[in-house]
Amino acid sequence: MEISGKTRLFGLIGSPVEHSKSPAMYNYCFDKWKLDYKYLAFDVDKNQTADAIQAFRTFQMKGANITMPCKQEVLKYLDEISPAARLVGACNTIVNHDGVLTGYITDGEGYIENLRHEGVEVKGKKITLLGAGGVSSAIQAQALLDGAREIAVFNKKDAFWEQAVAKAAEYQKAFPSQKITVYDMDDTEKLAAEIRTSDILSNATRVGMHPLENISIITDHSLFRKELVVTDVVYEPEKTKLLQDAEAAGCKTVGGLGMLIY
């Protein structure tokens, strides 16, 4: 559609954004469904976040996606924050509700909705989650909000380790009747034990994504059983090596593409 005097604006806020595919994707959808919206990418550094949100208000933008380095900083300038975004301490989406700017973290919601669409509920379930980065943290928060019984997080003792342990402690305090624990990914015996008692196994690492598409983060196929749901946040390739191996063992599998859509 052509730009009119009523065209409303959406955008991507962060830096760098010049290689983002979001403008092409959103503008294609707006045109396809004849919506009078346009989506632009705005290169905004962390110290420009306040000015960017003021501009958002001034121009009455409908919404925005937030990427690094603004995902934490932006929370200071919003009117409302979703429970999950508050827990995670980061925001990747802003929606303008009649002048009230609300921040959301959609990774966890997308993950849960993707599972639900495939007939899998997390309430009362135990999840083993591989990786402790930003996506993992969002999944942890949303799973706890949706009633997961227990979450076992595995991560290498790298630069993210202390942050992962601290965040899990925050979540545990917020959800005392549920359990969340962080373990060393290199402790293969503990990893095997947790997977064997889990309902859902989720990969929230980059393993399986190019150039690691021929690698699975789980090499012991005996850990796959028919009752185990195996999921992956990686969506390219749509069916990772982990999912291929799990499917061959009879597991129900859920890829990451649906998470992106939801």
Which residues does each PLM region occupy?
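Short, conserved loop/helix-junction motifs that constitute active-site signature segments
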Residues: 3-4, 122-123, 145, 218-227
